[in-house]
């Protein structure tokens, strides 16, 4: 029967899991990239249903109570189950659901923005292992939902929010063909450069969301494509492949004599490249090359690039040397996006491969970025390897992860005197020729320790020492 759905009624369907305990303790569900956790332990079908219901409620209130919600998913074995559970919650909130099936995260964002939807949801845990999954929510403009609306969803889950009456139950429509519009939009964004004939490109699809779309796009653009891990496979997504494991792509580029290669993560919102010599090309180099091209085209206001605290010092100093403005934010593409919007900047991203170009999209888009890098190389008349050599020399940098299951110790690592003293000693030793960055991951139970300096020996020494201190005092 249609009518008011009370918070009490919906709250009783939530299983008592560590994740729900976190809600009761007022800990935010939304991390740096949506809700994420271990399926069956932290992330369950009942919870996904609740998230769907309160997402529908919040988006209805924010979007004028009109329009559908676009839902997509990656290839994980749990993604369809969670998408169905979430969609049932959306429908119970009176929201129509347009289900894309397998689709990259930026495709969901694009189609949300261009289908008069009140929002979008992606079921994915990005680069995480197959047993994890997550829920990313987008506003009507295709950008990640702001913190205020995320908090409203969390309040609903705690029974602290009043629900709107549903005048009718929402309907569910399976429309995978809508992803074709996203693919066409990427090709159109290249303009007169939408011709990659003569380029041999290796793509590592990570058994994920771009497994079908990206090879089809590059072939239609005229490139010769060698595709790796190019089937949607929920058992193997991100396993020793994709943007976090470049070795197979590097070997394939060399074996095939390819001009370049691109590696995506499971939901294809990030990408890293490999040049024709088999060297990795990270987000810093991609930003430098694309930024220089946009500046030459007078499409980079203030010559500003927005990136994060993880960006290499060599990148920063090289960009400043050519007169550019270099802006750092906290780690997380939503922080980059917010700073870009505040400054009117058009290009930003992360070393990890989340690249945002607001000329074409409001979120990181691995497939679009790869297409533009390939087109940039084609137009330059020289190889990607040569372009990288002409850009900047990165400082030696090491990033090590320490697994700290205790959330309080991980998130409050600054309270560990031994670790803060070791960091201070490293900073004193390196001076302005290096830096240390320690932070708790927003997506995994990891403490990330990064050391960067002009001298590789210093980097190795201090990284090893800091990891040892962290393991001795935080585990």
Curated annotation (Swiss-Prot):
PROSITE patterns: PGM_PMM (PS00710). Activated by phosphorylation. It is an enzyme of class 5 (isomerase). Binds 1 Mg(2+) ion per subunit. It holds the Pfam family PGM_PMM_III. InterPro entries: A-D-PHexomutase_a/b/a-I (IPR005844), A-D-PHexomutase_a/b/a-I/II/III (IPR016055), A-D-PHexomutase_a/b/a-II (IPR005845), A-D-PHexomutase_a/b/a-III (IPR005846), A-D-PHexomutase_C (IPR005843), A-D-PHexomutase_C_sf (IPR036900), A-D-PHexomutase_CS (IPR016066), Alpha-D-phosphohexomutase_SF (IPR005841). The modification Phosphoserine is found at residue 126. It catalyses: alpha-D-glucosamine 1-phosphate = D-glucosamine 6-phosphate. This is Phosphoglucosamine mutase. It comes from Synechococcus sp. (strain ATCC 27144 / PCC 6301 / SAUG 1402/1).
């Amino acid at each position: 029967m249609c009518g008011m759905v009370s918070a009490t009624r919906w709250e009783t369907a939530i299983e008592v899991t560590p994740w729900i305990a976190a809600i009761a303790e007022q800990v935010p569900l939304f991390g740096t990239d949506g809700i994420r956790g271990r399926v069956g332990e932290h992330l369950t079908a009942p919870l996904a249903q609740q998230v769907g219901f309160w997402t529908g409620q919040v988006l209805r209130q924010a979007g004028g109570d009109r329009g559908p919600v676009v839902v997509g998913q990656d290839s994980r074995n749990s993604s369809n189950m969670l998408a169905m559970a979430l969609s049932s919650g959306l429908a119970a909130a009176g929201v129509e659901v347009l289900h894309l099936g397998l689709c990259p995260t930026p495709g969901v964002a694009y189609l949300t923005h261009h289908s008069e939807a009140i929002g979008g949801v992606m079921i994915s845990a990005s680069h995480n292992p197959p047993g994890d999954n997550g829920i990313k929510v987008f506003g009507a403009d295709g950008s990640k939902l702001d913190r205020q609306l995320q908090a409203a969803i969390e309040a609903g889950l705690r029974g602290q929010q009043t629900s709107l009456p549903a005048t009718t139950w929402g309907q569910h429509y399976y429309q995978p063909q809508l992803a074709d519009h996203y693919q066409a939009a990427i090709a159109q964004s290249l303009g007169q450069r939408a011709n990659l004939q003569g380029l041999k490109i290796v793509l590592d699809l990570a058994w994920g969301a771009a497994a079908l779309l990206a090879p089809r796009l590059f072939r239609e653009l005229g490139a010769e494509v060698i595709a790796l891990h190019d089937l949607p496979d929920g058992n193997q997504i991100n396993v020793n492949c994709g943007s976090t494991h470049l070795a197979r792509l590097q070997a394939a580029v060399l074996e095939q004599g390819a001009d370049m290669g691109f590696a995506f993560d499971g939901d294809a919102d990030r990408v890293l490249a490999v040049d024709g010599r088999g060297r990795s090309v990270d987000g810093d180099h991609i930003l430098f090359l694309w930024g220089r091209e946009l500046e030459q085209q007078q499409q980079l206001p203030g010559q500003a690039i927005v990136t994060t605290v993880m960006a290499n010092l060599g990148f920063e100093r090289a960009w400043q040397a050519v007169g550019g403005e270099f802006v750092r934010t906290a780690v997380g593409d939503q922080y980059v996006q917010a700073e870009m919007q505040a400054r009117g900047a058009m290009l930003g991203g992360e070393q990890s491969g989340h690249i945002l170009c607001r000329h074409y999209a409001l979120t990181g888009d691995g497939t679009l970025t790869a297409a533009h890098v390939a087109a940039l190389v084609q137009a330059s008349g020289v190889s990607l390897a040569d372009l990288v050599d002409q850009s900047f020399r990165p400082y030696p940098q090491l990033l090590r992860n320490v697994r700290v299951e205790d959330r309080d110790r991980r998130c409050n690592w600054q309270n560990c005197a031994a670790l803060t003293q070791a960091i201070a000693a490293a900073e004193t030793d390196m001076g302005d020729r290096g830096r240390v960055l320690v932070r708790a991951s927003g997506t995994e139970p990891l403490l990330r320790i990064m050391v960067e300096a002009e001298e590789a020996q210093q980097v190795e020494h201090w990284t090893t020492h800091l990891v040892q201190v962290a393991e001795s005092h935080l585990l």
